[in-house]
Amino acid sequence: MNNNHVYDMLVVGGGPGGYTAALYAARAGLDTVVLEKLSAGGQMALTEQIDNYPGFEDGIDGFSLAEKMQKQAERFGVRSEYAEVLRMDLTAVPKLLETSEGIFRGKTVVLATGADPRTLGVAGETELLGRGVAYCAACDGMFYKGKTVVVVGGGNSAAADALLLSRVAKKVILVHRRDTLRATKIYHEPLAQAENVEFRWNSVVSALLSGDRLTGVRLRDTVTGEESVVDCDGVFVSVGRQPATALAAGQLSLDKGGYIVAGETTETSVPGVYAIGDVRTKPLRQVVTAVSDGAAAVHMAEVYLAEAGR
């Protein structure tokens, strides 16, 4: 590897946003590399079935879609490197990324590092992913049409997920560790009026029950310690997300949740650095919105490079 080589664009993260940015950059003639620590696709690659991404009338699994996105970008000359970014200097000229595979330098940086859903931390949770355990109601809700589901959480995301699921599921059981929702008041009345939404206050999930698939949950009362079993077909874990922004802290503006502050232009507080997909502040985190961000970031990077004469 030539550590002195300067790329036009360094893309950190090989999810749908990252590879879309790389595709657009390569087609614009920008020398581009994608740095991914695991495998292409990010969280999308773990999704068993994606039915809300345009162009696939029968849906597609996340791994296959990720593979297609990577191959499409590489067809136009994008380089993929499997490397973990260990340190970033985003104000250096050129910008510098220290990785497990060496130093990378670039004129611009696109951060597509994503956000991981916070988990319940109970046994079997990982094994039941896609077999009854889900983290995205907008993605997987339709698989539970006419069924009974549990939503875990008490914030805005949990309330919104419960409302969305109440339109398709036979019954929604909202489980929260406190005796009232943390969600903003706008959600309280619609949830209270929904005839198929039931609340389990002062409760946490202590165990997942399953055969080949999830069959129910065991709840523990946080006040009395008593346990009970709830039969259900699915559990939606809506206890927040953890954005992968540790390396950006102190260099970029972050909101109180740790997300990189960036609007629809994807521009961050440092010129030439762009945040796309789940890692940035935004109202909706989906594959299609990450892809849109990737295209926008390249457009803004082209403007930046032209104005800077780079």
Whereabouts are the PLM-identified features?
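Beta1-alpha1 glycine-rich phosphate/pyrophosphate-binding loop at the start
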Residues: 3, 7-76, 159-184, 255
